[in-house]
Amino acid sequence: MEYEKKYIHSSQLFVAVRPSVIQTVLGSCVAVCLYDSKMQISGMNHYLLPLWNNDGLASPKYGNIAISKLIEAMEAVGCQRRDMVAKLFGGASPNNFNAQNGMLVGEKNIQIAHHILSEQRIKIVASDLGGTRGRKISLESNSGRVMLKYVQKTEF
């Protein structure tokens, strides 16, 4: 099977309705991967910061916006929330990078993903979170399978 390749950057999301491989590289950012096995459709977001503070544009740069928009985009192509499962990746803290208020940005990004997915009743079936190393992930859209490779600090 031939897969279309799609790379997403921070503040982006993508839902694949055709067989695709969606890729991104993460440091303290988090990616939420959603999969609907009935529709065989997947989507991924990549967010930089946990919460939009209602100042400026409500961008998918923020976890609370990015996760909601990803769920909405999946529903827009026919997926049902009750059929979605999630996989979470990222949230690293290389050398305590980006400490705010005593908590690292990566940790806050992880917390918001858990909170929103729990609130939306979307089960988290796999995760690789935290630590000090970045990650490159590749999501096969029609199977929901995620391949993960740890990367060196210089790669993200």
Swiss-Prot record:
The protein's enzyme class: hydrolase
Protein's GO biological process: chemotaxis
Catalytic reaction annotation: L-glutaminyl-[protein] + H2O = L-glutamyl-[protein] + NH4(+)
MF-aspect GO terms: protein-glutamine glutaminase activity
Cysteine pairs bridged by disulfides in the record: none
Entry keyword set: Chemotaxis, Hydrolase
Secreted found in the keyword field: no
Domain of life: Bacteria
Catalytic activity, EC: 3.5.1.44
Purpose: Probably deamidates glutamine residues to glutamate on methyl-accepting chemotaxis receptors (MCPs), playing an important role in chemotaxis.
Protein family (similarity comment): Belongs to the CheD family.
Protein name per UniProt: Probable chemoreceptor glutamine deamidase CheD
Organism: Sulfurimonas denitrificans (strain ATCC 33889 / DSM 1251)
Gene expressing this chain: cheD
